[in-house]
């Protein structure tokens, strides 16, 4: 019996889980279900498993359910026999989780920004706030990238760069962030990234 993941080919959070699963050798134990979600159109089938109606949502082999990409990755990290991708304890754990939260928080901002762009009357004030926070987060990540080991935070950073290319090519995010750009150019060649490429469909 396999685990079942509510999945979309465009969600960076779903992709985080799938890249993590590939990197830990667990992708073959996950069956994906294409699940359409939108802020204005709740998915009632998904709500039956996740009361907030968000993806990724993972149904485990025993029928219980986990949601939030970070929580799901923490769970997957307990299932494989290789090196842990999230430190289990000590200062390294908190540094890893902080870096992961920074990258994930920027993804949250980008999704809100994209939704605002799609409104009939978008707010310029929000646009300016989103751009300021994006530039601030990218600067912080540029400062830290060379010290971030392979793990959950680095995976999330790889996905972040790809999502910026997919949805915000006009930001030219590589400009002024040469270390992030070099990291992403290398990271996106990993088999796990190639196996989970974004499909705009």
Regions found by a protein language model. Name each.
Residues 81, 108, 146, 192-193:
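Generic structural signal for secondary-structure transition and capping sites
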Residues 27, 83, 172-174, 194:
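Short coil/loop linkers at secondary-structure junctions
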Residues 88-91, 149-152, 156, 198-201:
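Short, surface-exposed recognition loops or helix-turn segments adjacent to catalytic cores
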Residues 73, 77, 97-100, 138, ...:
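Non-transmembrane alpha-helical segments in soluble domains
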Residues 179-198:
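Charged phosphate-binding loop/patch that engages nucleotide di/tri-phosphates or the phosphate backbone
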Residues 103-185:
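GST-like fold's C-terminal all-alpha helical module
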Residues 1-125:
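GST-like domain detector, emphasizing the conserved glutathione-binding G-site
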Residues 58, 155, 187-190:
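Residue-level signal for nonpolar/aromatic packing positions in well-ordered secondary structure
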């Amino acid at each position: 019996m396999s685990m079942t993941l509510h999945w979309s080919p465009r969600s960076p959070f779903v992709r985080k889980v799938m890249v993590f699963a590939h990197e830990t050798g667990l992708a073959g134990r996950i069956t994906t279900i294409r699940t359409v979600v939108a802020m204005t159109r709740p998915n009632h089938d998904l709500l039956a498993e996740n009361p907030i109606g968000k993806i990724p949502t993972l149904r485990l082999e025993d029928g219980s359910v986990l949601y939030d990409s970070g929580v799901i990755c923490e769970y997957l990290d307990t299932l494989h026999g290789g090196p842990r991708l999230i430190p289990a304890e000590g200062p390294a754990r908190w540094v890893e989780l902080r870096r992961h939260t920074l990258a994930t928080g920027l993804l949250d901002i980008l999704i809100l920004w994209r939704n605002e762009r799609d409104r009939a009357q978008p707010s310029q004030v929000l646009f300016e706030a989103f751009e300021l926070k994006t530039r601030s987060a990218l600067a912080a990540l540029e400062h830290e990238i060379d010290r971030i080991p392979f793990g959950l935070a680095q995976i999330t950073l790889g996905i972040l760069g790809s999502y910026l290319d997919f949805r915000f090519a006009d930001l030219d995010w590589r400009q002024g962030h040469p270390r992030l750009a070099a990291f992403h150019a290398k990271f996106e060649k990993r088999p796990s990234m190639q196996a989970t490429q974004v499909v705009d469909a």
